[in-house]
């Protein structure tokens, strides 16, 4: 039970974020290695000032992706252009970037706006410029025109970022996703807040406020529900809550531990940790019927289950080998296999969306870091350089990991790219935040 106590202590350490303000994202490493891209401020074709500059949102998204580095707009050779017809390829000859994003915004009826954007292949443009005048339309990698309402500027900015990211990398963008996390503001009557926000910290929404701890939020595959652990009734219970209707369902309230929920790929079941029969073991609960099926059966602690993408197996953390390590269990055969061997401890594993890697917490020399292991080669790479890292959650496109950590004595969220090169911190004002969970594609 000492090991479980340490795990629970680690889980309760991470509590950081503001309720009334967006989480900022401060990039700490990896900018120099990113791919340069030019984003020209979108042209406003209306009276006064534009309601919001969409290009700022696109620049922020691409910067936070860890893949791209938007150039300083002051260094761009052209401004006030919105289409390839105005693009002077010769002027861009010495600009070290692979593509240019440009566009325009103009009023289009009451509280509506017509947004146009184009993605230009700058490498090809520079090559063609050496050959003399060419047909500029061949340089357009993508072009879109959309009518949006006044409250959709941020959303459509993220949509443009998704399109640009996928066009240039072949990987689906994740800028329209959200994160869930638990905020604690000590001194309040109900200090524990279950929150969701856009991936970049904007548009925060409180789902639940409680005088007792809330823990371990996790998203359903359709992005409509969250499962989480609540102590509001003075004991651990697992609830599932619809984020749109706010309807809550009590799924598990057995004696002892009810913890670590994880949705199955079809959204119909939860893998959980229960101690109703003695030691903490892994169970699978049918959400509709509440029936619980025991999966592991060992005298050691088994906890932190998560699903393989095919829904046929689970990962879980167990000390059955003497120290916490990650194991897998096949749901049909019950066969258990050890997955991790390097490091002192390995905890909280989850399989990446492509099924090729596992993200987890690795303890080596007494330090907790986020790590990645290639499931085919078993190569282990420590990704983070922060301390007391916990609760890693992978973006649905598999490119980034968000997790909890500490910075200057305060518990914060952080992010790291899947190759470990790009790192960012999400500082907040008052309060603490823990247990980040990245949504699926929405």
UniProtKB/Swiss-Prot annotation:
Part of the Tol-Pal system, which plays a role in outer membrane invagination during cell division and is important for maintaining outer membrane integrity. Gene3D superfamilies: TolB, C-terminal domain (2.120.10.30), TolB, N-terminal domain (3.40.50.10070). It comes from Shewanella denitrificans (strain OS217 / ATCC BAA-1090 / DSM 15013). Belongs to the TolB family. GO terms for cellular component: periplasmic space. The gene is tolB. One of its GO terms (biological process) is protein import. InterPro entries: 6-blade_b-propeller_TolB-like, PD40, Tol-Pal_TolB, TolB_N. It is found in: Periplasm. The keyword Cell division applies. Keywords: Cell cycle, Cell division, Periplasm, Signal. Pfam families: PD40, TolB_N. Residues 1-21 form the signal peptide. This is Tol-Pal system protein TolB. The Tol-Pal system is composed of five core proteins: the inner membrane proteins TolA, TolQ and TolR, the periplasmic protein TolB and the outer membrane protein Pal. They form a network linking the inner and outer membranes and the peptidoglycan layer.
């Amino acid at each position: 039970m000492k090991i479980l106590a340490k795990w629970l202590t680690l889980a309760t350490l991470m509590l950081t974020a503001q309720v009334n303000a967006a989480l900022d994202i401060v990039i700490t490493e990896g900018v120099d290695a990113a791919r340069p891209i030019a984003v020209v401020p979108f042209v406003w074709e209306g009276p006064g000032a534009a309601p919001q500059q969409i290009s700022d949102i696109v620049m922020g998204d691409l910067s936070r992706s860890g893949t791209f580095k938007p150039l300083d707009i002051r260094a761009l050779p052209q401004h006030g252009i919105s289409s390839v017809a105005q693009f002077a390829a010769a002027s861009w000859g010495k600009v070290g970037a692979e593509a240019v994003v440009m566009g325009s915004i103009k009023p289009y009826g009451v509280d509506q706006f017509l947004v146009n954007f184009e993605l230009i292949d700058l490498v090809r443009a520079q090559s063609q410029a050496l050959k003399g005048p060419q047909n500029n339309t061949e340089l357009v990698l993508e072009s879109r025109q959309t009518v949006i309402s006044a409250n959709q500027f941020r959303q459509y900015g993220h949509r443009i970022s998704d399109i640009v990211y996928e066009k240039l990398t072949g990987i689906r963008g994740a800028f329209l996703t959200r994160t869930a996390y638990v905020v604690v503001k000590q001194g309040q009557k109900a200090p524990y807040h279950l929150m969701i926000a856009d991936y970049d910290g904007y548009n925060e929404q409180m789902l639940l406020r409680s005088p007792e701890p809330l823990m371990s939020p996790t998203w359903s595959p359709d992005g409509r529900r969250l499962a989480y652990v609540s102590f509001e009734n003075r004991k651990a219970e697992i609830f599932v809550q619809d984020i749109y209707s706010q309807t809550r369902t009590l799924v598990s309230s057995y004696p002892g531990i009810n913890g670590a929920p994880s949705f199955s790929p079809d959204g119909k079941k939860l893998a959980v940790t229960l101690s109703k029969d003695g030691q903490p073991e892994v169970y699978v609960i049918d959400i509709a019927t509440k029936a619980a099926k025991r999966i592991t059966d060992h005298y050691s602690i088994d906890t932190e289950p998560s699903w393989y993408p095919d829904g046929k197996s689970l990962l879980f953390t167990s000390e059955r080998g003497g120290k916490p390590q990650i194991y897998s269990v096949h749901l049909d055969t019950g066969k258990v296999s050890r997955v991790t061997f390097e490091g002192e401890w390995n905890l909280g594993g989850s399989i990446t969306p492509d099924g090729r890697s596992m993200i987890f917490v690795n303890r080596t020399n007494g330090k907790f870091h986020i790590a990645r292991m290639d499931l085919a080669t078993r190569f282990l790479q420590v990704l983070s350089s922060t301390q007391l890292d916990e609760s890693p959650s992978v973006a649905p496109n598999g490119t980034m990991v968000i997790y909890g950590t500490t910075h200057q004595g305060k518990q914060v969220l952080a992010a790291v790219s899947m190759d470990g090169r790009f790192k960012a911190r999400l500082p907040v004002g008052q309060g603490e935040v823990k247990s980040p969970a990245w949504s699926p594609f929405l």
